[in-house]
Regions:
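Gly/Ala-rich beta-loop-alpha elbow adjacent to hydrolase catalytic centers
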Residues: 568-572, 576
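Acidic catalytic loop of the alpha/beta-hydrolase fold
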Residues: 57, 677-681
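Catalytic histidine-centered segment of alpha/beta-hydrolase-like enzymes
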Residues: 536, 706-717
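Short alpha-helix in the alpha/beta-hydrolase fold that links the catalytic acid
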Residues: 64-66, 512, 668, 682-691, ...
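Membrane-interfacial terminal anchoring regions of lipid-handling membrane enzymes
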Residues: 1-77, 81-479, 515, 733-738, ...
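Short beta-strand/loop motif that positions the catalytic acidic residue
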Residues: 666, 672-674, 678
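Short, surface-exposed "cap/lid" segments of acyl-processing enzymes
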Residues: 474-534
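Active-site nucleophile loop of the alpha/beta-hydrolase fold
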Residues: 591-602
Length: 780
């Protein structure tokens, strides 16, 4: 054997080993991926099925058959473009039973199987605009007439129409064709007699596959593909770069089945009756006519397939962010907070208009609205800036003039656009214009007003629902006691999120809120979950639900002002301190009034044991001996519950421990107020809170009071004045800092402007820079 032959054999063996490892890794990734099937029950045994799927990368040719076989027990055939049947990948596809569109007779393979009621088929077709598509060599729309859409599912539509037409003609009780013509047509499809044609319906099932997340970057798959050498074309390399990103990490795959499109019923529509009226001989001639009834029906069916696939998309955060970037007006600056609010607005629109949402989308958009850190959002921002879809500056984000202009109607990525897959997918989903256009173009004050109204209404609806569910004349106070409230002055100096105490209601802090509103502060009185209704409602709550109520209050106040102080009375003070520790950059200050780290009633330590005993008694059917509530004698009987659930006491203990551990993380100005003779909260709680605060800007005020509820009744105006002074001081400091930051940024911009003019010596360029400075200043 010649040395060159040995070298070629060694190289071929090396490529084979590498490809085998790639395929083995691919299978491993597919097994690890989380796959969710939606609406799979539409598949019926009496159907002859063609699956028409959205097609972004060649990975679907391997992915879909594996998933359908593993999760549904189906063994579909696959008809794929000939461009993929090259090199070792082509050999693997042939070995797995996949059929090349150019190397097979579709009549004797696909249509024959459909007529006999065999296994279903997945038809993968090249988009006509692809450079590797034979149909795209003559016309960018695939050789179709100029009025055609150039849709990627025309081949699947044509096969389905051919199968439905032949089934209808073969099974018709009276045919106009001669027996010789029938026999010749049967032979065309590899059939012996009309008895082989069963009575199943020919249907196309739209199938949408959505990946989440897709983080596009260089990957091992792309490097492995380079070993394919001359067998890998540009389109394959472009798509493999996406495939590697798709399966380079834990991926979630949503596969949604649309409602079956009955091709027989489609052909019985008045506009398509000429198709079914044709004889076999006439049909063969009309099928080759691009303006004939067969081609018109195929194009109409392809459009229906396209729309059905788009309707089944599983909308996720990548979709919403991509659509928002695409719709962001040129020249308009968006801050990070703008993206957060507008993404939540997109989510609200998606709830109304999209058929299916990713299961994590609601939690992600709520986290964005609450200004919580979300790695997925941070990664999307980074990718958008890195790929130059957006230009980042200290003023905000501006859309790049070079941003992607999507191709209308494309369901498949074009060569060289692997990095744009997320945007292509969103464009193909046809949710961009309906979901994101309003959110991107609406003025800031409109977005904030809409979100504020929505969030306040949600809080009120939740209260009304809980109040109606747990209503009891003995325990429930009037609705106005438990309703959350929003108070706004004419001119807002700042905002306050105000939380009430344990077993109380928003009415408890209403007097303080009214005082602060008269001093120019907007106040949102939070209703902690389980409060303001009945003790049975409180007994079912966890302290995390109380914290979530406070965070929702922050989101509401954030639509009014950036200067937000959080505060609370008693347990509400603990929640305020905890929120200030966790959301360090969200608040300008925090205050607590009689917040408990310790309580005077030492019997609270017995509560866990009593709860365990209650559970044991209920387990053995002795629930009448269990004691779930204890009597409570509150100061404000018109507000507080008169029965205290023991499970609520356990949650109170948990929130006190959580607060004690978070005090050192508080880095914003803080005010701690304590009553010297508090009969409920141990007075040592105030000094201990003050001592463990992480901030240096802190104040401790001790008032000579022998009551716990010092924010109502005698002596409360002094408490109000103390809180007011703290808020005014915090507002002044924040205002001074804003002016200082603005001056520094303005100085930096002027410095760059003067340096630029000095270097260029051209007044015109200086004038252009000055105009740019004016635009930035106005946007700020």
């Amino acid at each position: 054997m010649r040395r060159s032959d040995k070298g070629e054999l060694l190289m071929a063996a090396s490529v084979t080993v590498q490809l085998t490892d790639w395929l083995r890794g691919l299978s491993s990734k597919l097994m690890q991926a989380e796959v969710r099937l939606h609406n799979a029950s539409v598949i019926d045994p009496d159907m002859a099925v063609i699956f028409a799927a959205n097609h972004f990368t060649r990975i679907e040719t391997l992915l879909l058959p594996c998933i359908l076989q593993e999760h549904m027990g189906l063994t579909p055939g696959s008809l794929v473009p000939a461009a993929l049947f090259r090199g070792r990948v082509g050999k693997y596809l042939k070995a797995s039973g996949t059929v090349s569109a150019d190397e097979v007779n579709e009549d004797t393979t696909v249509v024959r199987m459909l007529l006999r009621g065999g296994h279903p088929w997945i038809v993968f077709t090249d988009h006509p605009a692809h450079p590797n598509s034979k149909r795209g060599q003559d016309n960018v729309l695939g050789g179709l007439p100029p009025q055609a859409d150039g849709l990627p599912h025309e081949e699947a539509a044509a096969l389905a129409i051919r199968a439905a037409y032949c089934r209808g003609r073969f099974r018709a009780p009276q045919r106009r064709e001669s027996q010789e013509e029938v026999t010749r047509t049967l032979r065309r499809f590899g059939l012996e007699s009309t008895e082989e044609v069963d009575a199943r319906r020919t249907v196309i099932i739209p199938l949408n596959i959505t990946y989440y997340p897709i983080r596009l970057r260089d990957n091992l798959f792309m490097r492995a593909a380079e070993h394919l050498g001359r067998h890998a074309n540009a389109q394959a390399l472009s798509e493999i770069s996406v495939q590697g990103s798709v399966l380079d990490e834990t991926i979630e795959i949503d596969i949604s089945f649309g409602e079956p499109l009955d091709i027989g019923a489609f052909l019985n529509r008045p506009e398509h009756t000429p198709v079914m009226a044709c004889t076999f001989r006439a049909a063969a001639e009309l099928e080759s006519d691009p303006d004939g009834p067969f081609q018109r029906a195929a194009r109409a069916l392809a459009r229906e397939i396209r729309d059905a696939i788009r309707a089944e998309v599983t909308v996720n955060l990548d979709h919403l962010f991509a659509g928002l970037v695409l719709e962001q007006p040129e020249g308009r600056l968006f801050k990070e907070r703008d993206y957060r609010e507008r993404l939540f607005l997109c989510y609200l629109q998606a709830q109304k208009k999209a058929r299916r949402l990713h299961p994590d989308l609601k939690a992600q958009c709520l986290a964005l609205l609450h200004d919580e850190e979300l790695p997925a959002f941070r990664e999307l921002l980074r990718i958008a800036v890195e790929k130059r879809y957006m230009l980042a500056s200290e003023w905000g984000y501006r859309v790049s003039p070079e941003r992607l202009r999507p191709l209308p109607g494309s369901l498949v990525i074009a060569a060289g656009t692997a990095r744009d897959t997320v945007l292509r997918e969103f464009e193909a989903a046809h949710v961009r214009s309906t979901l994101c256009r309003y959110a991107a173009w609406a003025p800031d004050f409109v977005v904030k007003a809409y979100l504020r109204r929505y969030l306040v209404r949600q809080d009120l609806r939740e209260f009304e629902k809980d109040y109606a569910c747990f209503y009891h004349p003995r325990d429930c106070k009037p609705p106005e006691v438990g309703q959350p409230f929003l108070l706004c002055p004419w001119r807002i100096r700042g905002g306050v999120v105000l939380a009430h105490g344990y077993m109380a209601a928003p009415m408890e802090v209403r007097a303080l809120a009214e005082h602060l509103r008269r001093r120019g502060f907007a106040v949102y009185g939070v209703r902690l979950q389980g409060h303001g209704t009945a003790p049975e409602d409180l007994a079912q709550q966890q302290w995390e639900n109380w914290y979530a109520s406070v965070v929702r209050g922050y989101a509401i106040m954030r639509t009014l002002t950036d200067n937000i102080v959080i505060g609370g009375f008693s347990t509400g003070g603990c929640l305020a301190l905890l929120a200030a520790a966790r959301k360090k950059k969200s608040f300008s200050g925090v205050f607590s009034i009689c917040a408990p780290l310790y309580v005077r009633n030492y019997s609270i330590r017995l509560v866990p044991s009593i709860i365990s005993m209650n559970a044991l008694l209920k387990r053995f059917g002795q629930s009448h001996y269990a004691r779930d509530f204890v009597e409570n004698d509150p100061e404000n009987k018109h507000i507080n519950y008169t029965r205290n659930p023991l499970t609520g006491v356990r949650q109170l203990t948990a929130i006190m421990h959580a607060t004690a551990g978070a005090l050192s993380d508080i880095e914003i100005p803080a005010l701690v107020i304590q009553a010297s003779q508090d009969p409920t909260v141990d007075p040592s709680s105030g000094p201990d809170i003050f001592a463990h605060l992480g901030t240096r800007q802190k104040q401790y005020s001790l008032f000579e009071r022998d009551r716990h509820g010092i924010i109502n009744g005698e002596g409360s105006p002094e408490i109000f004045a103390q809180v007011e002074q703290f808020l005014l001081r915090t507002a002044r400091e924040l205002s001074s800092r804003k002016y200082w930051l603005f001056g520094r940024r303005l100085g930096q911009t002027l410095s760059r402007l003067f340096v630029h003019r000095h270097r260029t010596g051209q007044g015109s360029e200086g004038g252009s820079a000055a105009e740019d400075l004016e635009i930035k200043t106005n946007n700020y």
